Every structure is written in structure tokens, then in C-alpha cells.
């Protein structure tokens, strides 16, 4: 396990169980690995603002969000970006105690071996942004006809807004709810830059 995480600190993960299953189901997938240096910085901030605003402040688990989720009866998500990255790379989708146990085991190891910037790089190359469309580069080309490096702030926010439900939400021709979500994400991305919560990956 430790060796596996260590290898992916240097090399890109070739694929994931979910990407393989989607490829078999759909016949093909779109995915192009790019360095985090070839992604617009505002995309990184937007995804962090949308999914894990305290990403730079925790070691893989956001205990405050976890306590809030427990108090809410488990009806709200509390997974950090590190947990989501671990799930995306090694585990299967769906909720089960065995999967959660493996996720809890892998997460601190990933935090130990990977920088925050590396975690975001892997996450943004593995996340699904539409049916069969994986990674920021393929998503930027698919939705906006441009490279991930050239995304505008609102385009970055729209991509972040479809997470984690890309089969229901659309970055192009978004619903009013998705537009509101993207607007809030754009504000959040500016906020975490201003207050220093993006310093660990900038």
C-alpha cells in the first residue's frame, strides 16, 4: 500500500476502477493527463472552494465537517479532497463500511507522501466532469473548446459546480441552480485566495 502511494507521488495513475467500468459501459472515455502547471490556477481554487474549502488546514480529514455530518444524521457529505482522490484512484463508488475503512487507511498515507498540490493534480486528472469525460483537460476541451490552462474564472467555477454529480449537472447550458452554485464557487475561490487558504497549492 505504501509503495503504491509512493509510486503515484511521481508517476500518474494509469487508470482507476471507475474509469475502467465506465469505459466498458460506454465503449470509450475521454481523458488526457496534464500537469497541474498546465491548469488554470483559478480551477484549483474553484474546486477547493466547492469541495473542501479547508483543504490546506487539515491532514486528510476535516473533523469539523465530520462532526457536522454526524450531527446531521449522515445526510451531508464530509469527504475531503484527499479522501475523494483516494476513492477515485483505488476504490469503488458507492457507500459501504469496507470501502470507508479502506479510504480511512489510504487517506493519511496519501497526505504523508503527496503534497497538497499533487493531491489536486491527481484529483483533477481523475474526476468525472460528464459521462465518459474524465480530468480537467478533457473537460475543458469538451465543454468549452479550450485547454484547462486557459479556463476563465466562470468556466472554472462551472466545472467545479458539476462535481460530484456530473451526470445530472451540466457546465454548458447549466440550470439556474447550477448557475447559482457556480457563482457561489467563484466567490469562494476569490475568498480562499484572499484569506490564504489556497497558499498550500498555489
Each predicted region: which residue ranges?
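Juxtamembrane regions of bacterial inner-membrane/periplasmic proteins
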Residues: 1-202
Amino acid at each position: 500500500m505504501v509503495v503504491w502511494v509512493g509510486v503515484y507521488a511521481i508517476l500518474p495513475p494509469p487508470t482507476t476502477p471507475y474509469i475502467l467500468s465506465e469505459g466498458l459501459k460506454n465503449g470509450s472515455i475521454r481523458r488526457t493527463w496534464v500537469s497541474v502547471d498546465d491548469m488554470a490556477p483559478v480551477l484549483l481554487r474553484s474546486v477547493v472552494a466547492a469541495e473542501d474549502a479547508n483543504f490546506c488546514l487539515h491532514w486528510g480529514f476535516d473533523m469539523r465537517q465530520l462532526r457536522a455530518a454526524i450531527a446531521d444524521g449522515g445526510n451531508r457529505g464530509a469527504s475531503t479532497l484527499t479522501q475523494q482522490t483516494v476513492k477515485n484512484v483505488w476504490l469503488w463508488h458507492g457507500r459501504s463500511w469496507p470501502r470507508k475503512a479502506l479510504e480511512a487507511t489510504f487517506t493519511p498515507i496519501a497526505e504523508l507522501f503527496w503534497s497538497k498540490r499533487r493531491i489536486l493534480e491527481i484529483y483533477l486528472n481523475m474526476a468525472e466532469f460528464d459521462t465518459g469525460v474524465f480530468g480537467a483537460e478533457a473537460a475543458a476541451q469538451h465543454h468549452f473548446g479550450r485547454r484547462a490552462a486557459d479556463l476563465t474564472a466562470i468556466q472554472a467555477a462551472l466545472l467545479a459546480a458539476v462535481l460530484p454529480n456530473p451526470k445530472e449537472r451540466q457546465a454548458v447550458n447549466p440550470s439556474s441552480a447550477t448557475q447559482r452554485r457556480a457563482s457561489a464557487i467563484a466567490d469562494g475561490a476569490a475568498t480562499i485566495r484572499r484569506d490564504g487558504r489556497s497558499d498550500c497549492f498555489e
